């Protein structure tokens, strides 16, 4: 992350939450692929790490910001939170089954993102999985809202991707089985993937819409997109 940007305590406190829908959907991926050892890169306040630790997994987190490390260390097991840059991960080769980076790569320069993917590939085990969420530069709402688009609202967002550009980048860094349409946890309240105009619709309809926005072709048109890839054997 660029050192000149203001990642202070207020920044991380404002974002001190866990989207349970993301956590449970990621848990489905972990269980279906029998993954045990997890690293959350850009872990922020550490809520996702804590979620997986409580679920019985060997979960770790890293962030390069002091305030994030202080917050994450308070709620997670001793020795599981590390101060580190995404572009220089201090872990052994082939040491993790899953690497997640939730709303992280938009904070990196293009060069840092390239280094992060190399580092992720290095420390993933054979057939290990990388899971990313980032703002979608191809979102219809970006074209409709212009400068008011949510991706622009955070000045620490410096690099943007579309599902296609990130797919190509992952492929260049030797990842395989790249997917942006994923199985989603169902029946978990969330407004995260829906336009504000439909936040008040009945919960059954909202659940169906959320599912479609992740597991159908609509996934590539959300404001933020999910993408998963695997280290080749």
Please tell me what each predicted stretch does.
Residues 1-92, 98-102, 117, 222-225:
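Conserved N-terminal segment of class I S-adenosyl-L-methionine
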Residues 15, 110-119, 129-230:
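S-adenosyl-L-methionine-dependent methyltransferase catalytic module, highlighting the catalytic core
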Residues 57, 79, 128, 175-176:
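A structural micro-motif
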Residues 103-107:
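Short catalytic micro-motifs in class I SAM-dependent methyltransferases
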Residues 108-109, 124-126:
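Helix-to-beta-strand junctions that scaffold the AdoMet/dcAdoMet cofactor pocket
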């Amino acid at each position: 992350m660029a050192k000149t940007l203001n990642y202070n305590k207020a920044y991380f406190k404002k974002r001190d939450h866990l989207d349970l829908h993301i956590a449970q959907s990621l848990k489905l991926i972990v269980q279906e692929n029998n993954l045990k050892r997890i690293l959350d890169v850009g872990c922020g306040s550490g809520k996702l790490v804590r979620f997986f630790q409580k679920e019985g997994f060997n979960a770790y987190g890293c962030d390069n910001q002091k305030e994030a490390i202080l917050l994450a260390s308070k709620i997670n097991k001793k020795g599981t939170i590390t101060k580190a840059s995404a572009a220089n991960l201090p872990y052994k080769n082939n040491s993790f089954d899953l690497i997640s980076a939730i709303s992280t790569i938009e904070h990196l320069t293009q060069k840092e993102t390239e280094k992060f993917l190399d580092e992720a590939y290095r420390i993933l085990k054979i057939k290990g999985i990388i899971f990313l969420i980032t703002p979608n530069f191809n979102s219809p709402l970006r074209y409709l809202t212009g400068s008011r688009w949510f991706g622009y609202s955070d000045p620490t967002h410096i690099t943007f991707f579309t599902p296609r550009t990130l797919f190509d980048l992952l492929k260049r860094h030797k990842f395989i089985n790249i997917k942006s349409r994923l199985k989603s946890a169902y029946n978990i309240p969330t407004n995260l993937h829906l336009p504000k105009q439909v936040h008040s619709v009945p919960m059954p309809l909202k659940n169906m819409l959320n599912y479609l926005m992740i597991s159908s072709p609509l996934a590539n048109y959300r404001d933020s997109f999910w993408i998963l890839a695997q280290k080749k054997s």
